[in-house]
Amino acid sequence: MSGEFPSAFLFPDPALADKEGLLCFGGDLEPSTLLAAYSQGIFPWFNAGDPILWWSPHPRFLLFPSELQFSRRTQKRLEQCAFEVRADERFKEVIGGCQKAVRKNQEGTWILPKIVKAYEHLFEEGYAHSLEVYKEGELVGGLYGVSLGAAFFGESMFSRQDHASKAAIRELCRLGVERGWKMIDCQIHSEHLERWGARAVDRERFLVLLKEALKEKTWRGRWSLN
């Protein structure tokens, strides 16, 4: 799977990851390395002072676009909020919003300057994408991730107003259904994503789904929402 994205850094078999999901460390964050990693079900995640750490957790947390579940109350609230969602207009601001977001039980951020730079390069190459959520012209939320074949790898999201991140996820799933995505990779478990319909899939099954997804067209370049 990594043949399409030659990298000087060769990744081990994802099955060799430890029980926490840590597979290896080192390498770089060049676009070719990141794409080779994603195509093998591997992603970077590390804190300041750490080497570059690469992960392939078991189980994997996935959201299938057609399985998004919002309560009637949430759906009603989203309609009342009347958010506008756009794509790939303010990638740098979206990743910056994710970087600054305060998260429960988390000190600081793993979205370090080198991560920001790496994903900005992927955006320039047409593989990383952002969804921006607006309220009365103001950016109030969004998400970003990587698109390869019929898979979207979600990296992070933020919300400055209640329900803004839900609007981003809803639009992402709508786009996924429209484009025939096999899955949205959420990487690791989170309670709110589980409430929205995401579920755990064992690594072997995830890698089979990924292999199938990579046979499909990659929606590379700037996205425009209908």
Curated annotation (Swiss-Prot):
It catalyses: N-terminal L-lysyl-[protein] + L-leucyl-tRNA(Leu) = N-terminal L-leucyl-L-lysyl-[protein] + tRNA(Leu) + H(+); N-terminal L-arginyl-[protein] + L-leucyl-tRNA(Leu) = N-terminal L-leucyl-L-arginyl-[protein] + tRNA(Leu) + H(+); L-phenylalanyl-tRNA(Phe) + an N-terminal L-alpha-aminoacyl-[protein] = an N-terminal L-phenylalanyl-L-alpha-aminoacyl-[protein] + tRNA(Phe). Its main location: cytoplasm. GO terms for cellular component: cytoplasm. SUPFAM superfamilies: Acyl-CoA N-acyltransferases (Nat). Keywords: Acyltransferase, Cytoplasm, Transferase. It holds the Pfam family Leu_Phe_trans. One of its GO terms (biological process) is protein catabolic process. It is found in: Cytoplasm. Its EC number is 2.3.2.6. One of its GO terms (molecular function) is leucyl-tRNA--protein transferase activity. Belongs to the L/F-transferase family. HAMAP family: Leu_Phe_trans. Functions in the N-end rule pathway of protein degradation where it conjugates Leu, Phe and, less efficiently, Met from aminoacyl-tRNAs to the N-termini of proteins containing an N-terminal arginine or lysine. This is Leucyl/phenylalanyl-tRNA--protein transferase. It comes from Wolinella succinogenes (strain ATCC 29543 / DSM 1740 / CCUG 13145 / JCM 31913 / LMG 7466 / NCTC 11488 / FDC 602W). The lineage of its organism: Bacteria, Pseudomonadati, Campylobacterota, Epsilonproteobacteria, Campylobacterales.
